[in-house]
Amino acid sequence: GRQGNPLFNEALVAIADKDLYSRTSPTQDAQLFQKYALTPELAHLLNVIVFGGNGPAPEMNRTDIAGIFIPDLIKVDLSTAGARLAGGGPAHPTDPDDAGFSRLGIFGGDVLVSTVQAGFGNGVVPGGWPNGRRFGDDVVDIAVTALISDLRVSPPIIRGPAGDNVDHNDVAYNKVFPYESTPQNGRNHTHNN
């Protein structure tokens, strides 16, 4: 399947269209799948289940969500300074996160300045996903925070952060290629409690 952006097919596309989504090209996203971004069922479910029926998540005309997910391509603004990288957390003794890195990207204050787009004003764009995707970007928390916020207005109404309560990787990321941490041993392992 194709997954330029995480969670679109898993969380927003209806079950009846999931296979179709995997078989089509991003050039067809606006025609076939934009409706799922403009009227995200997950926003409705968050309002009903998490907030008891009176939640803050806008459920209609989500042009902000469509702007992130349609078309399903990773969008990267190359006019900015280099991205900040995740390490082993801000207090890691030998491999801390770069100064200014936030797993919550723009919602955690991790922003860059673009010279080619207005972004959220004065060229401010996310320091991570959905402006590219770095190891350490907590895409679930960023996406859920975006769903319950309203990024269509100026200034944006930010609610959260919200998400899955997983706030770090169990092993530090590398700051040199290949950046990913060493994989867990599949045969001899223990579970963290």
Residue ranges and their predicted role:
Residues 1-193:
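Surface-exposed extracytoplasmic segments
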